[in-house]
Amino acid sequence: MLELLEYLVLGIGVGTVGALLGLGGGFILVPIFMLFMIAPHGSTFTTVQQVVGTSLFAVFCNAISGTFAYIRQRRILMRAAVPFALATLPGAFLGGYLSEWFSGPGFSLAFGILMVFIGYIMYSKSRGKAANKSVEDWDPATARFNMPLGVLCSFFVGFLSSIFGIGGGIVHVPMMLFVLGFPPQIAVATSTFVLFVSAVMGVSSHALLGHIIWGPALMIGAGAVIGAQLGAKIAKKSKPRLLVVLLSILVFLIGLQFIWKGAVGLGWF
């Protein structure tokens, strides 16, 4: 019973942060699973694929809850969200099957490199105007952005989401902020919708392959549903600049840890 309660609390925390920044929360869950819950450190998971599949299920729960919250707030730019979401589907499906080919050390190294890169980009850009653009100064009806580039990036977001179990928002939000010029609150809400759609395909493929451990997945997912509602409310009232800076540092440090773990596992040190 205590273990189930711990899963629920973990889900609430992950869901709150994930919806607040439009990142899904998988980037928090995967390191926790890998460091404490997979053999030889724990007994919940036995393979990396189970870590990814279970994490992605929690991301799905977080994203669907956050999507409904942001729809009520009218923060989702649907003319971007729908094509971006559709573009993630083939990438997510492909990633779900290619995840079978990732070994433990190789997975850790690739995941770490991705985390370090994203952490650096988020920190270097967080002090600029793009990260602090006001919704009031941006008209969604007339705003122009590079749709083909957004669609192309979204395909790779879906692929990364399913491969790494991180939801893809950790790539999508910076892209919408710093490449397409969306205000932070619009980028977060739109990313949450895209995560929901891409996670459907990713979760489906992982479920068919038996990669989801349903006990922890359901409890963490339930917590993520609750946390996403809290995160969406906080996002509506707050400026995410400080959170983005702190989060970028955390992502960078976790990435370094996974790079070291992967390199040691591959016999480089």
Located regions from the model:
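Juxtamembrane transmembrane-helix boundary motif
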Residues: 1-20, 28, 34-49, 65-160, ...
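Transmembrane helix-bundle signature of multi-pass secondary active exporters and lipid flippases
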Residues: 195-201
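Short hydrophobic/aromatic, small-residue-rich stretches within specific transmembrane helices
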Residues: 55-59, 191-195, 216-221
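Transmembrane helical segments that form the transport core of multi-pass membrane transport proteins
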Residues: 175-188, 193
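A short glycine-/small-residue-rich loop at the edge of a beta-strand within enzyme catalytic domains
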Residues: 143, 166-167, 191
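Small-residue hotspots at the loop-to-helix junctions and early N-terminal turns
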Residues: 45-52, 188, 192
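Transmembrane helix boundary and interhelical junction motifs in multipass membrane proteins
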Residues: 22-32, 165-175
